[in-house]
């Protein structure tokens, strides 16, 4: 199963992902209001965070939708909203704890990331490698290696200190 | 094991799916009094407005009950014999159960007004009401709406969008007290006036009578009387629990349940509009009669009927809709009596009127008459309110905090 992963330490805040997403969704413009991915800038906190739908395992938006417009695509595993079924009641926007569902004021329906049918444009246009589209297992592997590295660094550090300590005696 | 569910709505469908997750074999029987496929009452005003087509009312899986191994019976439950675990049905005789879920929902009530029960006066609560109102909407010109709850205002919006002349009468001094605070209500009333709706608050309807020309004559106390071609009434709902009269199942206006959706009888659960369950604010028994609460309760009840032991953290009331070109939403506590501090976002935030409410230093609720973008803030606040997390930040910084929080381990 492939998912979009975010490495916030790599994001440079160029907002290319937003432009790419806006274009594929609107078919004609790169205006950011059409984008499903949103890069949030926090100057004081020194943080730049691209946020897009996480396609939760047990999506609350899907459970709560009163018109059954939200389903899971069996091929891409994406949680998708069917325009023609959406009543525009915004219950899903209220349900999403990450703020990743948006409202299309022209069609009066909710909109969200659909993983571009398995070829997410935001990832394709990411210049810094912050966004990746990868097997969840690969991501876990990377996370594990990262943690391993941290631990081994820490171990080295403690061993050295212990050596110094014992020599000093 | 034999599981039986009374009702075929949000709570019931959520319960079926959750039950099947844990138990693929046991039989499930659903009893529906209303009949037909399960549909979404929430969507009736949207169909009336013409935003959704009729067939979109029906819930996913409502026509696939067979595939979920559900036996569907259209019948009325007359009584419950909880000692023998048997239901008495109108046409189908006795039905035995091992585990029972009462999810029979609620019905719209008639307020005590003289002449309220006559042809031409409707609720907007069932598919039947919708069908009859569709005819009125296309043939008539003037409608009076009595009551200003969520459904009433959406009915007003539907009538307004379809070019009818709308008058709204509310007995209380403001609109939607369960959804908005005082200022929010005021803004909503202003917004409706802009769309040409006559809004009467603090107005008592004394009597409704039909004139010879077929028009309704509505007598108001201390105000000039008004005329209407037809009338829609939204004056609250009451639980469908008449069949519990002779059973040992405890009930008042609704059925009190514990955190496991269990009633006082060991193998009887209740969920949705009929149930009064725990709230996130520590209340023991609260009935919201809201869609999301019904889904949550149904999910818990279904799992526990299948032998799980899943505890419900309590319900959090939430409402949202778009009408008269604004988004109206609220969550938790927002009325002045329930809070001790609040913050109203300024115009620059682009939210519209958005009030964040505090009690004892914790965020307990929020209400909004504004933009659709602001609704996502409510979504992000839901876990904060639910888990009673203290946020020691000025409210203007809250958005940033909520977005960054997710990445902090």
What are these regions (language model features)?
Chain B
Residues 390-409:
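Cysteine/selenocysteine-centered motifs that mediate thiol-based redox chemistry or coordinate metal-sulfur cofactors
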Residues 9-13, 35, 108, 128, ...:
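Residue-level detector of alpha-helix initiation sites
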Residues 1-70, 158-179, 375-376:
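Beta1-alpha1 glycine-rich phosphate/pyrophosphate-binding loop at the start
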Residues 372-392:
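A short, polar/charged loop-to-alpha-helix boundary motif
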Residues 117-138, 225-300:
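FAD-site-proximal beta/loop scaffold in flavoenzymes
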Residues 104-162:
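Glycine-rich dinucleotide-binding loop and its adjacent helix/turn
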Residues 25-27, 68-88, 94-95, 161-257:
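A Rossmann-like FAD-binding core segment of flavoenzymes
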Residues 1-2, 8, 21, 274-379:
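Mid-to-C-terminal Rossmann-like scaffold of FAD/NAD(P)H-dependent oxidoreductases
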